[in-house]
């Protein structure tokens, strides 16, 4: 080495190059140091560091021993203050004190506390820079990560690649839960399928499961679609039959299922309810005759005129009156036949 004096510590100042002179200070001095108003990282770590962090191989020097009462407490205090907040001369690289660092000694660790807190590595930094280090910030410091996709997509499109947060905003899915199974899309049937379903419905209102499967396979539909179609068709058919039954004077209880008849055939109920319709159908072909005969006797004007005009005839014998009445009835029958022919034609 051309400059051995730079690496070897000067003999006159052994205590200035020894770091951590306050490690073995008593609690009274540490409490005195705790009242220091500086909030630098060096001061905080040095004061709060326990004695277990002593460097390996370091032997306390006479200057690091507890001071005598009434002796140079001020000197140790000044020495500690020099290490805690070194002056501007000690932080410059050109001074001989900063040229030799504690890390050069073999007993110190490369990343130990003494090497970190030494004055040599911090020649380029200042207390203002230490205090002005910005904290770790995200793209949106005022919003949580779960709200970032909404803001990122609409208002901040350029910040989507700054902080990728996978799997964000999952609480709407947890609130909704599983999707409902019953939500089926409405099926649209073709004309051929609708005609085949209607034809099967006319045969049997309640289709059996084997027939339902066969019909579904034949029409290319699902079993559930055929089942739902039959349910809807039965409800529509029952509503129409109930309206007919109620309009004809029946009661709704006849349409409800019972133990004896769990599946009531509303077509039979509709025929039983309006019984007059069946009677009218039976009386349809022969109904005009009794009505005409019943109304012909009092309603015929000729029949009303003959008794008035032939009022003196009742004095005549009964034999003479009988042929007249017979002729009157014969005339009325002829007229009725003529009327019947007219109505039929």
Curated annotation (Swiss-Prot):
Belongs to the H2.0 homeobox family. Could have a role in patterning the central nervous system during embryogenesis. Has a key role in regulating the distinct phenotypic features that distinguish two major classes of ventral interneurons, V0 and V1 neurons. Regulates the transcription factor profile, neurotransmitter phenotype, intraspinal migratory path and axonal trajectory of V0 neurons, features that differentiate them from an adjacent set of V1 neurons. Residues 330-345 have a biased composition (Acidic residues). The keyword Repeat does not apply. The keyword Membrane does not apply. It is found in: Nucleus. The lineage of its organism: Eukaryota, Metazoa, Chordata, Craniata, Vertebrata. It comes from Bos taurus. This is Homeobox protein DBX1. Keywords: Developmental protein, DNA-binding, Homeobox, Nucleus.
């Amino acid at each position: 080495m051309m400059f051995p004096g730079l690496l070897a510590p000067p003999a006159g100042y052994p205590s200035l190059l020894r770091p951590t002179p306050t490690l073995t200070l008593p609690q009274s001095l540490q409490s005195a140091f705790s009242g220091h108003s500086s909030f630098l990282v060096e001061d905080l770590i040095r004061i709060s560091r326990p004695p277990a962090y002593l460097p390996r191989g370091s032997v306390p020097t006479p200057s690091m021993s507890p001071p005598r009462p009434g002796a140079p407490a001020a000197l140790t205090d000044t020495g500690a203050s020099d290490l805690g907040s070194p002056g501007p001369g000690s932080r410059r690289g050109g001074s001989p004190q900063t040229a030799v660092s504690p890390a050069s000694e073999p007993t110190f660790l490369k990343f130990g506390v003494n090497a970190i807190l030494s004055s040599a590595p911090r020649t380029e930094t200042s207390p203002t820079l230490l205090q002005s280090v910005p904290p770790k910030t995200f793209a949106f410091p005022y919003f949580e990560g779960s709200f970032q996709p909404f803001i990122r997509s609409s208002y901040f499109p350029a910040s989507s690649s700054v902080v990728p947060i996978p799997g964000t905003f999952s609480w709407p899915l947890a609130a909704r839960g599983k999707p409902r199974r019953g939500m089926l899309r409405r099926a649209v049937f073709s004309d051929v399928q609708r005609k085949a379903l209607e034809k099967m419905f006319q045969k049997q209102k309640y289709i059996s499961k084997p027939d339902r499967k066969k019909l579904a396979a034949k029409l290319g539909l699902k079993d559930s679609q055929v089942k739902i179609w039959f349910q809807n068709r039965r409800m529509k058919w029952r509503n129409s039959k109930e309206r007919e039954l109620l309009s004809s004077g029946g009661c709704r209880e006849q349409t409800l299922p019972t133990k004896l008849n769990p599946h009531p055939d509303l077509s039979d109920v509709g025929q039983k309810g309006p019984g007059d319709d069946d009677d009218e159908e039976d009386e349809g072909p022969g109904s005009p005759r009794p009505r005409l005969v019943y109304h012909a006797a009092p309603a015929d004007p000729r029949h009303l005129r003959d008794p008035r005009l032939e009022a003196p005839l009742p004095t005549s014998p009964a034999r003479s009156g009988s042929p007249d009445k017979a002729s009157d009835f014969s005339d009325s029958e002829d007229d009725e036949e003529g009327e019947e022919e007219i109505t039929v034609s």
